Amino acid sequence: MRKYEVIFILRPDLEEEKNAEVIEKFKNLIESHGGEIIKIDKWGKRRLAYEVKDFREGFYIVIQINAEPKLAAELDRVFKITDEVLRHMIVRENE
């Protein structure tokens, strides 16, 4: 397994419950595909460097995981089709 850092930005107009629901969705996806969650950081609402999908702010979440490369590809696919996610990035950390 490799170590990854997953960063994603949720729309700022979502309610706290919906944020938690989306985070839980990705948490379940990681665990169901054999990944291990090391740490979840909720950075909260922050200003974006530039406008993304007509939003100036976003709710940042950082998740550190141990996972196989297939899971990283699956996460990328699901992030792309999830409307609540403005941007995402999956980075493999050096061992």
From Swiss-Prot:
> Matching NCBIfam families, A to Z?
S6 (TIGR00166)
The cellular component terms of Gene Ontology attached to this UniProt record, alphabetical and capped at eight, are: cytoplasm; ribonucleoprotein complex; ribosome
The record ties this protein, via InterPro entries, to: Ribosomal_bS6, Ribosomal_bS6_sf, Ribosomal_S6_plastid/chlpt, Transl_elong_EF1B/ribsomal_bS6
What protein name does the entry list? Small ribosomal subunit protein bS6
Q: Which UniProt keywords apply?
A: Ribonucleoprotein, Ribosomal protein, RNA-binding, rRNA-binding
List the Gene Ontology MF annotations in alphabetical order: small ribosomal subunit rRNA binding; structural constituent of ribosome
Which organism is this protein's natural source? Answer: Pelotomaculum thermopropionicum (strain DSM 13744 / JCM 10971 / SI)
The cross-references to Gene3D superfamilies, in alphabetical order and at most eight, read: 3.30.70.60
**Which Pfam family, giving just one, matches this sequence?**
Ribosomal_S6
Function statement = Binds together with bS18 to 16S ribosomal RNA.
User: What family is it from?
Assistant: Belongs to the bacterial ribosomal protein bS6 family.
The gene that this protein is the product of is rpsF
The source's superkingdom equals Bacteria
**Biological processes per GO annotation:** translation
